[in-house]
Amino acid sequence: MTSTRSLLLASCVFLLAGCGVDDHGMILVVDHSYVPAVTVTTSDGITTPDGILWWHGKLIMADEGGRALRVWNHGPDVVTLCDRSLGILEPEDLVVDGEGNLFFTDDTAGGLWEVDRNGHAFVVAGRSKGLFSTEGIALAPSGDILVGDGVRHEVFSVTRDGRVSQFLDANRGITKPESMVYGENGNLYIADNHDDVLYRLTPAKKLERVLENREGFSPETIWFANHVLYITDSKHGKLSRYTPEDGLETMVAFAGKLHDVCGVTTDDQGQLYVSIQDNESDRGYVVKIGHDAAKDVIPLAAQHD
């Protein structure tokens, strides 16, 4: 069943400390080349999505609260790829290879999981291989899957047949490799939302602290597209962009029930999508941040089933 989405315009100067936010939440677009629109809600068949990924015209979602992987294809409902019957508990982040094989992590069940291009779902390497609480994930140039573990404070490399080896050990200082993505020139970006640090790992495995000790900054999910690193911050309710030339810039701020912004991805046209969790109400949203007419503040009104 679809829901009626009502977006009301408001005039307000947004402050992170509060702005007369209503019970339903508010979105402030700082970059006026974008405007938000609610795309998917709990009424469409999701619970509380975390990681999201745009692939071949479809939005793939790690539905953390629903213990499932789901796909939205512009229709009224979503399709479930796999669920808790497989053994997954809280799917976290995901990546897809060039052949359409989907890999994802689970910070509660642990392990690296796969839904292959034929729709067969299985665990590639589980807790028995030392993957206790898997978070960030990235597809390495070698074809192996890099997986961050928040309990062991390490990053592992996993082959397609489930062989696990150490990629970055705990001595490198990353406490919680929450999200990972490759940027330009073979650099791997790693978000640590425990220590509030954005790292960059060069091809020579030199680990650099790109952003740290910044008030109001805690990287949740990172995504690289069009020479820009996009960063969500669920702790402070922000979507930002980073380039070496311009530094860190806030694009969108979220408040109220829309505060906890999680995943981020881009479609083929460069439109942004973010996932939002309202865990108090056990509801979730996917919001498109698209290139349309500029709007300042858009509070989300009631969601009518």
Where are these regions (language model features)?
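A short beta-strand motif characteristic of beta-propeller blades
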Residues: 36-43, 78-84, 120-127, 164-170, ...
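Bacterial signal peptide processing site
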Residues: 20-22
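Short loop/turn segments that connect beta-strands within beta-propeller blades
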Residues: 72-77, 115-120, 158-163, 201-206, ...
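Bacterial N-terminal signal peptides that target proteins for export
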Residues: 1-8
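C-terminal motif of bacterial Sec signal peptides marking the signal peptidase cleavage site
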Residues: 16-18
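Structural motif
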Residues: 111, 239-240, 281-287
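Beta-rich, blade/repeat-based domains predominating
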Residues: 43-56, 85-99, 128-144, 171-185, ...
